Amino acid sequence: MTNAQLSLEIAKRYKVSILLARILILRGVRSPEEAEHWLNWDLPCEHDPFLMKNMDKAIKLVSAARESKKKVWVYGDYDLDGISGSAILAGALGDWGLPVNWMLPNRFDGGYGLSAVTLQKMKDSGAECLILIDTGITATEEIKAAKEFGMQVLVLDHHKPSGEGLPNADAILDPFLEDCEYPNKSLCAAGVAYKFLYALYQKTGKPLSDLEKYLPLVSLSTLADIVPMSAENLYLTRKGMGKFSDSDCLAIQILYERLASDKNFVGSSDIHYRMAPLLNASGRMESPDTSLKFLLCKDKEEIEALYEKLTEYNTQRRKVELDIYAQAIKRLKEIYGSNLPRVLVIDFLEWNIGVVGIVAARMAQEYKRPTAIISVQSDGIAVASARSAGSFNWHAALFPCRDIFIRWGGHVKAAGFNIAAEKINELRIRMEEQANIQGFVPVLEESINYDLEVSLSEINLNFLHELKKLEPFGNENSYPVFLARQIAVRGLRLLNGGHIRFYAVQGRTSISAIAFNKSYLADSLKKGDVDLIFEARSNVYQGVESVQLIVAGVV
């Protein structure tokens, strides 16, 4: 069967457009039956949680803690995945009959992960059992100290082990453990927590339906942590997105009522651009505690105050982010002049460490080079956040250089580390060496990839509504990008902030288009007909919905 025949068969069987069927084929669909995985949101795709190594051990540990009424603490991370995972554990274990205390790390006071100070605080409070979420898989020394304090330790993580041995916890749940048969290696930490609780409820006879109210938190984490959209992640995220509108959780109700652009549907863009930044803002500006309190709050007056505080944090975050970005550009020129290396390492005194990761991502995108943004603290310790560009692997680059870090961790595309300020120049040299080992070369004139060539007449509101069937869009399920040829440009206007607005015209079809931060395209657009690369989005203005093209580039 040719692709043309397959797209026709998919369109006919599932009553969708040929264009949507073509997108499904690009997603790897090779038969009409495979298309059901994408189009039927109710098609189950969950793996048996008991396939996860050490699941029985973990259940026995918390069951014994409940039986003996032990004091249990949940300790997470300061990003949304750690916050959501902590909320799921605190809420669902409490529902199960095991009340827990919780604590989160603070970027500005102790940094990432478990610390000696934190352990001492929990010991002084009488902690007997510690559950780590979104952290712990590399915390060998810290868990050793917890065990010496007499605590039992359960680790729920989704990061890869360091390769230097596992911590001596009582039980570790992590899909990346050696010999772990759990098929989905792409779970976020909140997803690991959910699977653990699913197994716990199943084993102890508590209704599994009681867990469904926590699924929106799994959706938030899966999208915010940018984990690959595997089949199970797709299923769990969709279930969670569908629960926003009828949740009995006050926080989810508020997020839905105030931040969902379409009250009939919570989409991935609502989470990516509205909900996740709001919930991450408290940890970036002060303490993540505000976000966790918000997610767990059951008092209507208190939750309003918490939401207002989160909104204030988010406003502050935007301003600080813009300020640091401008300073980073200036500092870049001071360090390197016009001769940029393959890896950018940009340091400055006491930048806000909560937003350096956002700035690093923006710089990496702008300069097409992996970038580490480093905030040098008054005590001489420098705190860094790094983001990748192209094929550069941060984890592979940092691992051979771990001798110069006070602490470090990360993935292929992102990393963080603490380093003594006097070693920053050495870091610059060694990162260039690692770029050479990896064969990384910045591609300054990157071609803009697109999925399909279309005519503008195919891009209408019916298609955009139909496109929601492929939600949620994220890692390994990206929002489709289109190419339309011979587009006439009409009514071009330059806007403040370096944006361009115009009408894209092809035949009898005219659609509003905007190019964000792309004033450099103005000359190309003024020349006449262009081949336009874009995303097609829905825009609602004064209650009227219309199609808007978000321009990625011109050919």
Predicted regions and their residues:
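A common structural junction motif
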Residues: R402-R407, E433-F440
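Beta-strand elements of well-folded, non-transmembrane domains
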Residues: V454-L456, E471, N517, A536-S538, ...
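Beta-strand/loop nucleic-acid-binding surfaces
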Residues: R508-S524
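Short acidic/polar mixed-charge low-complexity motifs
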Residues: G380, G507-S510, V544
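OB-fold single-stranded nucleic acid-binding module
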Residues: K423-R430, L521, K526-V555
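Hydrophobic helix-and-loop "lid/oligomerization" segment in the mid-to-C-terminal part
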Residues: L6-C129, E148-G150, N168, Q202-E426, ...
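Active-site cavity-forming subdomains of large catalytic enzyme subunits
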Residues: Q120-A190, Y194-K203, K213, S230
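Accessory interdomain/linker segments of ATP-dependent helicases and helicase-like nucleic-acid enzymes
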Residues: E445, L452-A513
